[in-house]
């Protein structure tokens, strides 16, 4: 029994080994047959990929049509807003400051009361001057009465001619004294008036320079407060010396040159004024000239020492051919645009540009009104290629679509 079992186990192991050997031999014999099939499929796949790239969708672009417009010509420069007048308010008399009649930052008018110096000493001085004047007026009246009597007595030779002349001289002297007294009264009155410190100009007051209770003097350089006149307000900016002739020519033609003030980022128009004057010399260091413009500034959009961008309108070019700035490209040979024909084929065309800003460019030569130019999708263009002109919304939707990106990746693969 034991020998019989051993024999059966030996047969089973032999069958397993034989089956394994047969499977190994069969798999080796099929692999050479399968390889030619795979290799045969490769050229077909590559060819299909190339056909897919050739037959893929047209490159989408956005386009604009060249138009004719009246284009303003601006001269631009950097500038600083300055107050039309800046006045340091000082006391013209010495004394104790007893009151301030303004709030810091307040808008004041010329003649408004700003501060009060203790007027006591000036009132006393005025009273003394007025008293002396009254005394001398009485003396003059008495001298004139004596003179009248002397004149009557002189007719009867009761007084000498010398006495009459002496009395006349006394009257004249007293009249001179009264004139001096009147001047003293006026001076004392002026000192009293000056104890009331008023605004010399209209404008905005700054921070106070002295507190109530301090003894102040007419020699104090800091003053009491500084007033800046901001209605109107001035803008001083610079232009290259090459622009001087254009400005002078416009002035001689009698034009009122409009100046615009824009914010620091040059994105928001702050105010509009007019050219006031040009400086009388060029800065040799920078080769620029200073220009002053004046603004009414009723809305207080401009503030002293504010940095702004200035634009001055000097001329307007009529019937100029204009295209969006995005259409104009720069290459080794200069500026160019991609022009579309009726079949939406593109071609590169050199142009000469003129006036330009952030949005539009004037084409001085190379284009005509009505020509279509590519404004977006330029990086995908080649000479003579046919494109698909789409609206901006369509292009944005296509760029955000995952399926389109996946399709493009597949074509490139």
Curated annotation (Swiss-Prot):
Keywords: Cell inner membrane, Cell membrane, Membrane, Repeat, Signal, Transport. It is found in: Cell inner membrane. The keyword Transport applies. It is a peripheral membrane protein. Residues 1-20 form the signal peptide. GO terms for molecular function: efflux transmembrane transporter activity. It holds the Pfam family HlyD_D23. The keyword Membrane applies. GO terms for cellular component: efflux pump complex; plasma membrane. Residues 397-413 have a biased composition (Basic and acidic residues). Residues 31-57, 391-413 are annotated as: Disordered. Part of a tripartite efflux system composed of MdtA, MdtB and MdtC. Belongs to the membrane fusion protein (MFP) (TC 8.A.1) family. This is Multidrug resistance protein MdtA. It comes from Salmonella paratyphi C (strain RKS4594). The gene is mdtA.
């Amino acid at each position: 029994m034991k020998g019989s079992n051993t024999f059966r186990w030996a047969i089973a192991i032999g069958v397993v080994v034989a089956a394994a050997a047969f499977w190994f031999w069969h798999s080796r014999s099929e692999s050479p047959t399968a390889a030619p099939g795979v290799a045969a499929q490769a050229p077909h796949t590559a060819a299909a990929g190339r056909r897919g790239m050739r037959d893929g969708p047209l490159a989408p672009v956005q386009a604009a049509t060249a138009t004719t417009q009246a284009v303003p010509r601006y001269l631009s420069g950097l500038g600083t807003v300055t107050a039309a007048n800046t006045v340091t308010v000082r006391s013209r008399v010495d004394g104790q400051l007893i009151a301030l009649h303004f709030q810091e930052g307040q808008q004041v008018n010329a003649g408004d009361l700003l501060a009060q110096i203790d007027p006591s000493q000036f009132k006393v001085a005025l009273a003394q001057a007025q008293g002396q004047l009254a005394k001398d007026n009485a003396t003059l009246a008495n001298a004139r009465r004596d003179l009248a009597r002397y004149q009557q007595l002189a007719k009867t030779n009761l007084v000498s001619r010398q006495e009459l002349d002496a009395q006349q001289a006394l009257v004249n002297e007293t009249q001179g004294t009264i004139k001096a007294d009147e001047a003293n009264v006026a001076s004392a009155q002026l000192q009293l008036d000056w104890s009331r410190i008023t605004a010399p100009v209209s404008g905005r007051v700054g921070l106070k320079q002295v507190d109530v209770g301090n003894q102040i003097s007419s020699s104090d350089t800091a003053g009491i407060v500084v007033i800046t006149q901001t209605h109107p307000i001035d803008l001083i900016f610079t232009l290259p010396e090459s622009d001087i002739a254009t400005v002078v020519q416009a002035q001689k033609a009698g034009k009122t040159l409009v100046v615009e003030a824009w914010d620091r980022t040059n994105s928001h128009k702050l105010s509009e004024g007019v050219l006031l004057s040009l400086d009388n010399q060029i800065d040799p260091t920078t080769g620029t000239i200073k220009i002053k413009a004046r603004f009414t500034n009723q809305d207080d959009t401009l503030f002293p020492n504010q940095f702004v961008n200035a634009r001055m309108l000097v001329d307007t070019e009529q019937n100029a051919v204009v295209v969006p700035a995005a259409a104009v490209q720069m290459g080794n040979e200069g500026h160019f645009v991609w022009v579309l024909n009726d079949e939406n084929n593109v071609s590169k065309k050199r142009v000469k540009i003129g006036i330009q800003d952030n949005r539009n460019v004037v084409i001085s030569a190379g284009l005509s009104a009505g020509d279509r130019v590519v404004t977006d999708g330029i990086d995908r263009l080649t000479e003579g290629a046919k494109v698909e002109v789409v609206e901006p919304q369509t292009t944005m939707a296509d760029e955000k679509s995952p399926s389109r990106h996946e399709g493009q990746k597949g074509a490139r693969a």
